[in-house]
Structure formats: structure tokens, C-alpha cells
UniProtKB/Swiss-Prot annotation:
Belongs to the universal ribosomal protein uL11 family. Part of the ribosomal stalk of the 50S ribosomal subunit. Interacts with L10 and the large rRNA to form the base of the stalk. L10 forms an elongated spine to which L12 dimers bind in a sequential fashion forming a multimeric L10(L12)X complex. The keyword Ribonucleoprotein applies. The gene is rplK. CDD domains: Ribosomal_L11. This is Large ribosomal subunit protein uL11. One of its GO terms (cellular component) is cytosolic large ribosomal subunit. Disulfide bonds: none annotated. GO terms for molecular function: large ribosomal subunit rRNA binding; structural constituent of ribosome. Forms part of the ribosomal stalk which helps the ribosome interact with GTP-bound translation factors.
Amino acid sequence: MSNKKVIKLIKLQIPGGKANPAPPIGPALGAAGVNIMGFCKEFNAATQDRPGDLLPVVITVYSDKTFTFITKQPPVSSLIKKALNLESGSKIPNRNKVGKLTQEQVTAIAEQKMKDMDVVLLESAKRMVEGTARSMGIDVE
């Protein structure tokens, strides 16, 4: 791999197991000259155990048009919505509260997301989760 030159990094958010050549995936990969169906098949195979989760993926495209990709944990907002069974956050987060997140839920989300965050301490990750929850109109106990 060291002799291949990286020509592009593509960052997308794709539902697990549901990659297809339609926008936004097709145009982003097509512009880089990547085999779109090859990526879709590999991504779907790698994420078939996480259906429906919105997964950030970083695709590295090399000069010979090959690629590698790394999937990350879902965004904190998606994890919060999943924990509280919400469709979306509040449209007016300072006035309308749409749910309440317990400290146990905050800790579980922070532990799950910690490897993708640039933090060392669990407390720092918990504060980031709490901030995201507040910006979505969710109270934190």
C-alpha cells in the first residue's frame, strides 16, 4: 500500500447495508473514478449487521483507482434519537423539550462513540454528548 498515492478522501454518511449507486454515493465516487458497484457491495457486506444506522464512512481513493474505506460509529445525534425513540430533535431547542436523557444513557452513548471522538477521558465524552442533547432540545438529568 505504501507505493500507492492517495488522490482523494471522500467522507459520506450512509445507512448501514443500504449503499446504492444513487446520489450522493454515485456522483461522489464516479468523480473520483472508483468502481461504484464494487464499493456498494463491499460496504453493504461490511455493514449488514448494522441495518438502518447512519454510518460515517471515509473512503480513501488511490492513484490506480482502488479504494479502502473506514466506517465509524453513528453520529451522537443519531444515537440519542435511537436511545429515546425520537424521529427528530426540537425545532426550538431552548423552549420546546422533546425528551429526557438519563446519565446511564449518556454514559452508554459516550462509551460507544469515544473511539471516534478526540478525547481521552470518559467525562469529556459525556460532556460532548450532553451538549449535543441540549442542542437537540433534550434535557439531561
